[in-house]
Regions:
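Conserved catalytic motifs of ABC-family nucleotide-binding domains
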Residues: 177, 447
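P-loop NTP-binding/switch modules centered on Walker-like glycine-rich loops
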Residues: 47, 190, 194-267, 460-542
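ABC ATPase C-loop
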Residues: 168, 173-174, 444
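Conserved ABC ATPase signature
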Residues: 155-160, 164, 426-430, 434
Length: 623
């Protein structure tokens, strides 16, 4: 795409410092220079703490609490925003430059309708009348591929999905036709399937309106779909800058090369392990049912979250559980831990039944099954020191106190590759990656047989997440611990797992070895997840959007049968008169995987090898 040669944004010698008033200041951004041409999308990429969001906010003349712009200039359309008065900055923000944040939920007032909030900026800046703003909002809803664009604005924020809310926040930012829009990690919290829709909508609207954009991210695969040029940052310094193709395929700086290497987790160790003999069974989950609400005549909860799910894991083995938000992954982990009592089924640990309610389990059973949650910020007490955090499970499970406890804390820190000095620090003072290592060390303090890892890398940037993955593999090799690894990232689950369970709407739709889920045929839902994982190449987004939005085969009314395939409404391979009339059964494929599908193995393989053609007319396999 051609861009005007004169820059819209010119950043020269930008320096940002942080610290307490009157105290010592630390430089966060070290004199960076870059430009953004009109109609261009520039990506700022780097790890957490690299300065990318700080730089992006400076384009609005803003510095976060405890920080200030200490030097340099930031010119937007020839005006240095660093010299503007508070009144002038208020007029600038939301009018000439707009901001799309990571958390759409935090950007909306739950007590006001969506439309009122989307048009508010246009009314404040008096760029149009209320009626004009409402019409413009509907145009944006349509351009952003939102459902029911004429009426969605009448809803409240809690009445739309996360992906829809993210696009509605984009409409809020774009309502005033800004010259520059800043997108700050806008898809980090989304599933891969939802991410495709949101990225495609953002890209389409930005290109159509001809505006400039800054895309802040730690994910190179996502940036490859959005940016014309990339600026690579670490420690507040620009390490490399260039066109997207050059950065992706011919990076010159070692730091950029490390970012690219972290995109695809290595699996050499997992390959070697996969060839070994099957380990002895440790955990066996049989027909687990969980949900909420009153009981039905069948004894099941009124709202079922898990629908007769099976899972089996051996000693020293990792079973990956993958699916979108709402698929039941976290509920399954909590059922295994006893935090959510199952209403049906059985859980065996070393062949012995585990009570379904955590209150009825013994201390020894609790010790053997530990859980590490996604968000270490909420899992750790921020005012407790690391030593105190790790000492508690040592005392509770093993009766270890005093000097012996301090020695064991030191050993645990060494295990998770943290320096000994961290022991005296409060957990709230640590980085995201350090907190997650402490979270893991706390679980290891119990000396468990099984650790339930619930999205343990999803809140971390690519490089830090890759380091945690490497740590998990190393700990498993040293300690023989088993993992249930829960994620929505197909690359991560393939990199660390021996076996993989695919959940959709609380049902197990596929189970197989890691190798079986590395190549088709898959269940149609597994194929969607695989196809939705971003690839490190420009143009992938357009290809993925075309695959994911292929027209579905029309079908008649469905039978009144709760056992029908849960993926029916989204499946590109559904068969009228079959999928909407009878429940599928688990079938075993040649590669050993089990899939819950009417389609034959040959149909699945043919469809997934030639996705553009489709094979809707082909008849299902005989039951």
């Amino acid at each position: 795409m051609q861009h005007e040669s004169n820059p819209l944004v010119e950043v020269r010698g930008l320096r940002v410092v942080g610290g307490r008033p009157g105290g010592e200041e630390t430089t966060i951004v070290h004199g960076v220079d870059f430009e953004i041409r009109r109609g261009e999308v520039l990506a700022l990429i780097g790890e957490s703490g690299s300065g990318k969001t700080t730089i992006a906010l400076s384009l609005m003349g803003h510095a976060r609490a405890g920080c200030r712009i200490a030097g340099g200039s930031v010119k937007l359309g020839g005006t240095d925003v660093c010299t503007l008065s508070a009144h002038a900055l208020t007029a600038l923000r939301g009018r000439k430059v707009a901001y799309i944040a990571q958390s759409a939920a935090a950007a909306f007032n739950p007590s006001r309708t969506i439309l009122d909030q989307v048009i508010e900026s246009a009314l404040i800046h008096r760029t149009m009348t209320r009626r004009e703003a409402q019409a413009k909002a509907v145009e944006l809803f349509r351009a952003l591929a939102l459902p029911e664009p004429e009426t969605i604005g009448k809803r409240y924020p809690h009445q739309v999905s996360g992906g829809q809310l993210q696009r509605l926040m984009a409409a809020m930012a774009l309502i005033t036709d800004p010259e520059l829009v800043i997108l700050d990690e806008p898809t980090t919290a989304l599933d891969v399937t939802t991410q495709i829709d949101v990225l495609q909508a953002f890209k389409s609207v930005i290109r159509r309106c001809g505006m400039s954009a800054v895309y802040v991210s730690h994910d190179l695969a996502v940036v490859a779909q959005m940016a014309d040029r990339i600026v690579v940052l670490s420690d507040g310094v620009i390490r490399e800058a260039g066109d997207t193709e050059q950065i992706l395929h011919a990076p010159t700086h070692p730091y950029t090369q490390s970012l690219i290497a972290a995109v695809t987790p290595g699996d050499a160790e997992r390959n070697a392990k996969a060839a070994s003999a099957a380990p002895a069974p440790l955990l066996d989950v049989r027909g687990a049912v969980a949900g909420y609400g009153g009981r039905t005549a069948k004894g099941w909860p009124a709202k079922v979250i898990l629908h007769e799910v099976d899972l089996r894991i051996g000693r020293g083995q990792t079973v990956g559980v993958i699916g979108e938000s709402g698929s039941g992954k976290t509920t399954l982990a909590k059922v295994i831990a006893g935090l959510v009592p199952a209403t049906g089924g059985q859980i065996l640990l070393d062949g012995e039944p585990l009570a379904l309610d955590t209150a009825k389990r013994t201390k020894e059973q609790h010790r053997r099954v530990q859980i590490v949650f996604q968000n270490a910020d909420t899992a750790l007490n921020p005012v407790h020191t690391v030593e105190r955090t790790l000492a508690r499970p040592l005392a509770f499970y093993h009766g270890i106190k005093g000097a012996r406890a301090r020695q064991r804390v030191a050993e645990l820190l060494e295990l998770v590759r943290l320096p000994q000095a961290v022991a005296a620090r409060r957990t709230g003072e640590l980085s995201g990656g350090q907190k997650q290592r402490v979270n893991l060390a706390r679980a290891l303090a119990a000396e468990p047989d099984l650790i339930l890892c619930d999205e343990v890398t999803s809140a971390l940037d690519t490089v830090v997440g890759a380091a945690i993955m490497d740590l998990l593999r190393d700990l498993q090799a040293k300690l023989g611990v088993s993992y249930v690894f829960i994620t929505h990232d197909i690359a991560k689950v393939r990199a660390i797992s021996d076996d993989i369970v695919v959940l959709y709407a609380g049902r197990r739709v596929e189970t197989g070895s890691r190798d079986a889920l590395c190549a088709p045929p898959y269940h149609p839902y597994s194929h969607l997840l695989v196809s939705s994982a971003p690839e490190l190449r420009a143009g992938w987004l357009d290809d993925a959007a075309e695959r994911c939005h292929r027209p579905l085969v029309p079908i008649g009314a469905s039978a009144d049968d709760a056992e029908l395939c849960p993926f029916l409404s989204r499946c590109a391979m559904r068969v009228d008169g079959v999928c909407n009339r009878s429940a599928p059964t688990l079938r075993t494929l040649e590669n050993g995987a089990q899939v819950l599908c009417h389609r034959s193995e040959e149909d699945l393989a043919r469809f997934q090898a030639e996705p553009a053609e489709g094979i809707a007319p082909v008849q299902p396999a005989r039951q």
